C-alpha cells in the first residue's frame, strides 16, 4: 500500500509556538481593547420571536477571567501573579549567572546588582511587562480585534519581527559597500576616489522611493508571469521580502560611505599611519590595523540611527503597496488594511 502525505506550507517559528494561545481562535469582527463584546450590533431572535439589536459577547476571550470576575480585580491579580513568576525566574538566573560573585568573600547577594544596576533594572522592566502582557493576552484582547477577528496584539508583535528582520538584513547588505568603498575612496584617493564618488552621487540623485517602487513592480510582473516557479504564497512573500531588503541595502549605503571616506582621508595623514608607510607596511595591512578600527565608532552610530529609519521605510512602502507581500504581517500592511475603514468607522 502507498501512503500519501500532505505537508503544511506555513512555517511555524518559535515565536508562533509561544504566541499560539493568543491567536489560534478568531472572533467575528472588530472589538475594543479589553472588551467582552463585539464592536458592532447584531440582530438576535428571543424565545417569543422578538428581534433585538445587541452587542454579541466574544467567544474566546473577554468573558473568561482567570482570577476574579471583576475586570479590574482580575487585571490587578494578573499583574501580581506576573511579578511572582518574574521573581521566581529572576532569582534562578541571578544566582546561576552571578554565583561566583555572590559567594566570593566579602560579597553579599546584592553585590552583582550594584555592579550592573542599570542593565538589570532595564531587563527587569522589560521581562515584567512581557510576562504581564502575555498573561493578559490569554484572557483579553489587549488591543482588540481587527475586521476578521484576529488579535491585533499578535499582529503587532509579528510586525515587530518583520521590521527587525528588514532592518537587520538591509544593514548586512549595506555595510560591505559602505565600509570598503568608503575606506578605498578616502585612503587610496585619486582615480578610485573619483569613481566611487561618481557612483554614490549618481545613486543619491535618483529618488529612492521611485527606485524601490520600480524594482518591486518588476518583481511583481515576474511573479505574475511565472506562477509555477512558486509552490505557495509563502515562497512569493519570502522572495518579495528578500528583494525589498536587497533594494533598500543597495540604496542606503551612500550616506555612511561618504562619512567613512572623509574619516579615512583624515586618518591617512596621522603620524602612526605615515610611520607605518615609512616602515614598508602594505596598504591592506594599514587599512586592517589602523583605518578600520578607528572608523568603527562611526559605523556603529550610523547603524543605530538608521535602523529605525529602515523600519519606517518598510511601513511607508507597505502602506503604498510596494513593500512586503500583503500576506506578511507588518505595520504598513496593518495601516493599509485599515485605511478604508478609517472613513467608515473612524473610532475603530
Where are the predicted features?
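Alpha-helical transmembrane segments of integral membrane proteins
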Residues: 119-123, 145-348
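Gly/Trp-centered helix-boundary motif
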Residues: 1-170, 174, 334, 338-348
Amino acid at each position: 500500500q502507498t501512503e500519501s502525505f500532505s505537508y503544511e506550507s506555513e512555517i511555524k517559528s518559535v515565536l508562533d509556538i509561544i504566541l499560539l494561545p493568543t491567536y489560534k481562535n478568531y472572533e467575528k469582527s472588530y472589538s475594543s481593547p479589553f472588551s467582552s463584546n463585539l464592536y458592532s450590533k447584531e440582530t438576535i431572535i428571543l424565545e417569543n420571536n422578538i428581534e433585538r439589536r445587541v452587542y454579541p459577547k466574544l467567544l474566546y476571550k473577554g468573558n473568561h477571567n482567570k482570577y476574579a470576575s471583576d475586570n479590574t480585580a482580575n487585571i490587578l491579580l494578573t499583574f501580581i501573579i506576573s511579578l511572582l513568576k518574574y521573581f521566581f525566574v529572576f532569582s534562578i538566573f541571578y544566582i546561576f549567572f552571578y554565583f561566583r560573585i555572590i559567594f566570593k568573600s566579602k560579597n553579599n547577594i546584592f553585590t552583582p546588582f550594584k555592579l550592573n544596576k542599570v542593565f538589570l533594572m532595564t531587563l527587569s522592566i522589560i521581562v515584567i511587562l512581557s510576562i504581564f502582557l502575555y498573561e493578559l493576552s490569554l484572557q483579553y484582547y489587549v488591543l482588540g480585534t481587527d475586521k476578521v477577528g484576529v488579535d491585533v496584539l499578535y499582529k503587532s508583535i509579528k510586525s515587530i519581527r518583520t521590521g527587525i528582520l528588514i532592518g537587520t538584513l538591509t544593514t548586512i547588505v549595506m555595510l560591505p559597500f559602505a565600509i570598503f568603498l568608503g575606506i578605498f575612496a578616502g585612503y587610496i584617493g585619486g582615480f578610485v576616489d573619483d569613481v566611487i564618488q561618481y557612483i554614490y552621487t549618481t545613486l543619491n540623485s535618483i529618488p529612492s522611493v521611485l527606485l524601490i517602487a520600480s524594482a518591486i513592480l518588476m518583481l511583481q510582473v515576474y511573479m505574475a508571469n511565472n506562477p509555477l516557479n512558486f509552490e505557495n504564497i509563502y515562497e512569493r512573500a519570502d522572495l518579495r521580502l528578500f528583494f525589498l531588503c536587497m533594494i533598500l541595502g543597495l540604496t542606503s549605503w551612500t550616506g555612511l560611505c561618504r562619512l567613512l571616506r572623509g574619516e579615512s582621508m583624515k586618518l591617512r595623514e596621522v603620524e602612526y599611519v605615515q610611520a607605518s608607510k615609512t616602515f614598508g607596511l602594505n596598504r591592506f595591512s594599514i587599512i586592517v590595523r589602523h583605518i578600520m578600527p578607528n572608523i568603527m565608532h562611526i559605523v556603529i552610530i550610523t547603524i543605530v540611527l538608521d535602523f529605525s529609519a529602515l523600519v519606517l521605510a518598510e511601513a511607508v512602502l507597505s502602506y503604498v503597496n510596494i513593500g512586503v507581500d500583503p500576506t506578511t504581517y507588518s505595520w504598513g500592511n496593518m495601516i493599509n488594511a485599515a485605511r478604508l475603514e478609517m472613513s467608515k468607522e473612524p473610532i475603530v
